[in-house]
Structures are given as structure tokens and as C-alpha cells.
Amino acid sequence: MATFIFLLALIKAQNTPGDYLALHNRARAEVSVGPMQWSNTVAVYAQAYEEKRKGDCAMIHSTGPYGENITAGYYPEFFRADAVKLWANEKPLYDHAYNKCVGGKCGHYTQMVWRSSVRLGCARMPCKANSQFVVCNYDPPSNYIGEKPYDSWVV
């Protein structure tokens, strides 16, 4: 019984807003970008968007007032940290000198480390086939084509 309670506490501990925030801020610190703060307002927006996707869990961006990363995990448990790690793992695909993504696949990472986005709100919901749908929104919006996410002198 004690093992079950410990595992339940561990699962719960890996599914808090702080998990989203800590991993975002770690990725930002690696390139000398200041930390983000959790925003309940932005988190409410993320939750409302998830509710719209509840029926299909389609990987479609909200086109709302914030920057956005979305993903889904197909595990019995897909923790908040897992989603953020997927995005952070795109870092090697970003060439800061040329401001290019290898294969065009680093936009989640650049959204995470964008210097002007300072507020974060995220949400997660279960979907079909044991998947989890995760959305994080960034305020103010960013990730503009042709602009670098952070200054070159910081790397």
C-alpha cells in the first residue's frame, strides 16, 4: 500500500504547472534568456482550447492571441514534463547563426526560448487510445519568421 501511495504522489508531482515552467526556464537559461512566469489567464485560455479539441484531439493550432505549442503523447502516462522535453529536444535542430531549423523542425524549441514571451500557461487532457493532448501558450506571442528568438551574444 505504501508503494502505491508513493507512486501516486510521484505521478501527481510530475503533473503540476511548475513542471511546465521549470523545464521552459531551464531551456531559456541555457541560452541566457530570462525566466517566464506562470499566468493563470494564459492557462485558462489553454484549457478552453483543449475543451474545443476534446472530441477529436486533432493537432490543430488555435490561431488565438498567444504563441502556442501542442503535442500528444501515446503512453499510458504522458506527463507534462514529457511534452516540454519533446520541444526542448529540438534544440540541436536550431542553427542560431543562420536562424534556420534543420528540416524545418525546431519551431517548438524557438517558441520556448523566445526572449519576449514572458508568461506561460499550459493544459493537458486525456484523449482517445490512451493519448494525452498538451498545449502551452506564450504571452506575448512570438516565434516570428525571420527573427531570432534570442540575441546571438548569449550563446
Residue ranges and their predicted role:
Residues 6-7, 24-25, 92, 101:
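Generic signal for short, ordered secondary-structure residues
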Residues 1-13:
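Cleavable N-terminal signal peptides of Sec/SRP-targeted secreted and luminal proteins
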Residues 11-15, 37, 73-77, 112:
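Conserved, non-catalytic sequence blocks in retroelement Pol enzymes and Pol-derived host proteins
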Residues 66, 74-155:
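Disulfide-stabilized extracellular recognition modules
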Residues 12-67:
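Short, well-ordered surface patches within globular domains
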